[in-house]
């Protein structure tokens, strides 16, 4: 991409920084990811349906999982959440099944939203357990003290202090007051949804005060246009593009590697970087696969330097194209 290439006017907010960053867990925060975050925030704030489309491998699903904190949510156990991070979950990520029906879509979305509600209620449940256990132990000690008095019979056993029941009812009322925290539903692989399932998705959107994002391949916007009732509710459209050559080059020059991949510390020569940029075309999934194969080829040849020949050998073991 030429440095002097004209820049077309942007209809959506642009990220404050175009620098590609990596997080501690290896996630690549590209400029496209930051645009997706701003797009998602807008859908959430304005309660619109957003349509996100892009070729495979550019990072749509990864960005959606990152935004919704799906990885943290997947390990949540309501009854054993000691390690649960103190963050608010308000985004549902739903991946459409290959075979789907309206009832199944409604059931899956309902369960996902109930899970967010259970997380929102859990702090109250923990507090209630602690307070009620303290009251119970206090009452138990008091009953024991009375029963151990000289001349006391089992018939003299005192009744439980009504404060326990009042406290229990108080916390039950607090839990019932907790509303559904869902403010955004992200539907990945929306291309799989049939007409009736899309109508069910629209019904879910209409029934709640929330935003929604449909993620799919290029062409999904034309398919959705055939459903006027759904199409009329779309407020934002975002195209998830491949990484620019300069961004991929900057990523490689900082010796970025996918999670689980270890490459020599000697770095990459400009020729190798240029070859990787040209081979992958900004496709993040393809870049990840290619670097994984580079690691394998280095091990097979007991080499310590990444050369153009090593990259070519790694390329030959892959089907280069839109992955």
Regions found by a protein language model. Give the residues of each.
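Sensor-1/coupling segment of RecA-like P-loop NTPase cores
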Residues: 54, 162-166, 193, 204-228, ...
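Conserved AAA+ ATPase core "coupling" helix
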Residues: 104-107, 227-258
């Amino acid at each position: 991409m030429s440095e002097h290439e004209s820049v077309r006017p942007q209809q959506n907010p642009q990220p404050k920084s175009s620098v590609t960053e990596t997080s501690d867990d290896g996630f690549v925060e590209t400029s496209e990811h930051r645009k997706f975050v701003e797009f998602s925030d807008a859908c959430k704030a304005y309660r619109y349906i957003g349509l996100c489309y892009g070729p495979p491998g550019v990072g749509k699903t990864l960005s959606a999982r990152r935004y919704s904190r799906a990885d943290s949510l997947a390990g949540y156990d309501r009854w054993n959440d000691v390690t649960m991070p103190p963050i608010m979950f308000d985004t549902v990520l739903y991946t459409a099944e290959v075979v789907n029906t309206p009832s199944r879509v409604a059931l899956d979305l309902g369960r996902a939203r109930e899970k967010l509600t259970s997380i929102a209620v859990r702090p109250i449940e923990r507090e209630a357990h602690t307070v009620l256990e303290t009251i119970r132990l206090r009452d138990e000690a008091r009953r024991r003290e009375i029963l151990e008095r000289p001349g006391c019979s089992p018939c003299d056993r005192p009744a439980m202090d009504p404060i326990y029941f009042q406290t229990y009812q108080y916390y039950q009322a607090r839990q019932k007051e907790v509303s559904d925290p869902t403010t955004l539903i992200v539907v990945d692989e929306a291309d799989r949804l049939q007409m009736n399932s899309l109508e069910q998705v629209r019904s879910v959107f209409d029934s709640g005060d929330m935003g929604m994002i449909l993620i799919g391949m290029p062409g999904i916007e034309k398919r959705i246009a055939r459903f006027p009732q759904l199409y009329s509710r779309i407020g934002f459209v975002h195209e998830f593009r491949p990484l620019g050559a300069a961004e991929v080059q900057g990523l490689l020059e900082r010796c970025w590697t996918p999670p689980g991949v270890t490459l020599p510390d000697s770095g990459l020569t400009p020729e190798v970087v240029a070859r990787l940029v040209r081979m992958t075309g900004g496709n993040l999934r393809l870049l990840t696969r290619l670097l994984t194969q580079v690691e394998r080829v280095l091990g097979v040849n007991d080499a310590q330097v990444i050369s153009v020949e090593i990259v070519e050998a790694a390329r030959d073991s892959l089907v280069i194209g839109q992955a």
